């Protein structure tokens, strides 16, 4: 199970995708937990789907930080609530 990093200095943003292709990114505050932004992101996803129903829309809340020269990412899927981690 992936745990959210709460200690590192990080950048956090909302990523909107259509069919897997990123179409919009918005920076959000890095304070607090990523799950605190779920209600607003779910509302935004519903609004997008209502206006453009033919797209395969998804939203993730993402954060990234440097750890000993390695860039780490965490992605929270708004629909499933699943948290994933990646290292670059």
Question: What function would you assign to each model-found segment?
Answer:
Residues 4, 16, 27-30, 61-63, ...:
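Intrinsic disorder/low-complexity segments, especially N-terminal tails and targeting/processing regions
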Residues 6-26:
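Short aromatic-glycine-(Arg/Gly/Cys) micro-motifs in beta-strand/loop hairpins
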Residues 21-39:
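A short, exposed loop/beta-hairpin motif centered on an aromatic-Gly-Thr core
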């Amino acid at each position: 199970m992936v745990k959210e990093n709460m200690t590192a200095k990080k950048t956090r943003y909302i990523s909107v995708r259509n069919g897997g292709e990123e179409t919009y990114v918005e920076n959000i505050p890095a304070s607090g937990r990523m799950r605190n932004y779920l209600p607003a992101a779910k509302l935004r996803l519903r609004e997008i789907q209502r206006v453009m129903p033919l797209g395969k829309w998804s939203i993730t809340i993402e954060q990234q930080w440097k750890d000993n020269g390695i860039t780490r990412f965490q992605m929270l899927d708004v629909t499933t609530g699943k948290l994933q981690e990646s290292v670059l």
